[in-house]
Amino acid sequence: MSAIQGIEGVISLLQATAMSARAQDSLPQPTISFAGQLHAALDRISDTQTAARTQAEKFTLGEPGVALNDVMTDMQKASVSMQMGIQVRNKLVAAYQEVMSMQV
């Protein structure tokens, strides 16, 4: 009898889990647009460049706690993020041109 009760307990637990999963599925999911994602990525690139510029200014002014290796790392991060942004732009332009050249 205890095995049956154990199985019934597991079944009721699975049913409760399924009910909560259905309840979560019915909640409206936030939608993020492509333009919103692109704008957020551009903001992150801008923030990275601003942080690198600020670090470089602090190092140039001789503020304590700002090491050259940190400045160089931040500058490289900014450079890589900018190059990534340029490559994404190039791919988007190429995709747009390909779509526009398609025959309807």
Swiss-Prot record:
The yes or no answer to whether the keyword Signal is present is no
User: Which Pfam families does the protein's record reference?
Assistant: FliE
The record, for InterPro entries, names: FliE
The GO molecular function terms of this record are:
cytoskeletal motor activity; structural molecule activity
GO BP term (any one): bacterial-type flagellum-dependent cell motility
Task: Tell me a GO cellular component.
Answer: bacterial-type flagellum basal body
Keyword Transmembrane recorded: no
What are the entry keywords?
Bacterial flagellum
Where is the protein found, in the record's own terms?
Bacterial flagellum basal body
Family per similarity comment:
Belongs to the FliE family.
Name used for this protein in its record: Flagellar hook-basal body complex protein FliE
- Give the species this sequence originates from: Escherichia coli O139:H28 (strain E24377A / ETEC)
